[in-house]
């Protein structure tokens, strides 16, 4: 009357949801799904950070170049322009 299959079914029914959450199978499945979700989220964050770094690096390089050209133009125009005007007067 007590077959192995009947015994395991009775234990599961008596344990209810508490035993189901305690089984390793459910824990492994949940942890795997969380790990996959965490991995995807980390990958998305890394991609976003890399894109921001690329933008900031390219923007910083352009800004430096623009400033250096502006400084060169101003410094070369003022002394040369003033000295020529002083000499002609």
From Swiss-Prot:
Subcellular location: Cytoplasm
Region annotated Disordered, chain positions: 1-89
GO cellular component, one term: cytoplasm
Chief place of localization: cytoplasm
Flavoprotein keyword on record: no
Subunit structure: Interacts with CALM1.
Protein name: cAMP-regulated phosphoprotein 21
Protein encoded by which gene: ARPP21
